[in-house]
Amino acid sequence: MKRKLFSMLLSAFALLLLMGAAEVPEQAELILAQEESVAVADEQMLETEIQLEVNDVSAEGEEMPEATDEARQIAEEPAVLFDELVLIDGQPAPIEIGRIQNAGTTYVSLAAMAKALDESAAAAWDGSTGTVTVTTEKLTITARMGDYYVVANGRYLYVAEHVGQNNGTIMVPLSVVTKAFDATLNWDAATGTIHVRRGSGALMSGDAFYNQDDLFWMSRVIYAESGNQPLEGRMAVGNVVLNRVANPIFPNTIHGVLAQRNQFSTYKGGKLANRTPNEGSIIAAKLVLDGGVVEEVKDALWFDAMCSNSWAARHKACLVIIGGHKFYG
């Protein structure tokens, strides 16, 4: 009986051992599965962290891309500024033209405005004379600080308030520059905008423009009547002559006006033709023949040498005194 009981116990114990052996693999498999799951999760997390780092690097790269040569050039070039109130062929002029107002006249830098109108324009400065010379393929312009004119292709263009200087650059009226470049100039009063339209690039030369007969007589009468006067005094005499040419009560040519009886005593007996005008008188003649007008005598038809007993002094109103002459209208 005891043996039988012991045998049964052994069998039961063996059975229990067999059952335990079956559970161990299952537990091992479970543990391995859990560890594998954790490893996968860790691997996924690691991949995610790596991807985030890659994305961060990529994002930083997008913020600071490697500059191309073109980008570097653009970055290095200074910003170009424009004068929105001066339009050249519809486009704003560069701010370097330095537009200013002087006695109601718009002045600009001669060198900068020339460059804006013609890319080939080159400027040369002579500090000893205060003169700037601008050259293009078609045009040569010379302006000297303090002068009352600019010379363009041998033409003398009047500057009523004289050639100036601002911030180290020679300044002249915009109207003079546009005339020299054969450009048109218009002002829009509603917007305050100045419109410039390019033309041929250069005005006609002095040799082709000035009528030699007119220049002959005008330079001589200016010299004879006012050769010792300041430039505007000489021009004023020339203006009176041209005012008469334009007035129907006088002859319609310069020579005709001078030859009219009892008008210009310097003409009598051929004396005027035999005069040799000085340089200042020739310049004054060219200025008035090119449209230069001394504002105060724009309506004057007579002048005298401060003579209170002249016909004009007794019958006409004195408009202005310039130098040693009175002018009447």
What spans do the regions from the language model cover?
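Sec-dependent N-terminal signal peptides
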Residues: 8-14
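Residue-level detector of solvent-exposed, low-hydrophobicity positions
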Residues: 13, 95, 100, 114, ...
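Intrinsically disordered, low-complexity sequence elements enriched in Ser/Thr/Gly/Pro
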Residues: 1-2, 232
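Primary recognition of N-terminal secretory signal peptides and signal-anchoring hydrophobic helices
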Residues: 2-7, 18-219
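Bacterial extracytoplasmic/cell-wall-associated proteins, especially those involved in peptidoglycan
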Residues: 203-329
